[in-house]
């Protein structure tokens, strides 16, 4: 076949397979904060399986470990650092409220 007759054929490119984010020696545990923190977004949400590139079993173990760490207050439920900075800068008035009748 002539090359002009098959313009939509994909070229075969070599690609490097990425290493898995969890090694065989890593223990998925609620106390392993360095491992758990890799799978949480900046907002404190658990990242999806596609983003993490984990297997289904690994993702389940990571989610339960994150939830256990949250319950034991090792991890916050939400990352509210920006909200705390805003509320600290706003001056609050401490006085009695006057009701309009």
Swiss-Prot record:
Residues 1-23 are annotated as: Disordered. GO terms for molecular function: small ribosomal subunit rRNA binding; structural constituent of ribosome. Part of the 30S ribosomal subunit. Keywords: Chloroplast, Plastid, Ribonucleoprotein, Ribosomal protein, RNA-binding, rRNA-binding. One of its GO terms (cellular component) is chloroplast. Belongs to the bacterial ribosomal protein bS18 family. Transmembrane segments: none annotated. It comes from the Eukaryota. It is found in: Plastid, Chloroplast. This is Small ribosomal subunit protein bS18c. Residues 1-19 have a biased composition (Basic residues). InterPro entries: Ribosomal_bS18 (IPR001648), Ribosomal_bS18_CS (IPR018275), Ribosomal_bS18_sf (IPR036870). One of its GO terms (biological process) is translation. The keyword 4Fe-4S does not apply. PROSITE patterns: RIBOSOMAL_S18 (PS00057).
């Amino acid at each position: 076949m002539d090359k002009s007759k098959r313009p939509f054929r994909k070229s075969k490119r070599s690609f490097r397979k990425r290493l898995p984010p969890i090694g065989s020696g890593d223990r998925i545990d609620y106390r392993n904060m360095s491992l758990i923190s890799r799978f949480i977004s900046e907002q404190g949400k658990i990242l999806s399986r596609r983003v993490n590139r984990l297997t289904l079993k690994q993702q389940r173990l990571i989610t339960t470990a994150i939830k256990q760490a949250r319950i034991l207050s090792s991890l916050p439920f939400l990352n509210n650092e920006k909200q705390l900075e805003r509320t600290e800068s706003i001056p609050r008035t401490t006085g009695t409220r006057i009701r309009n009748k």
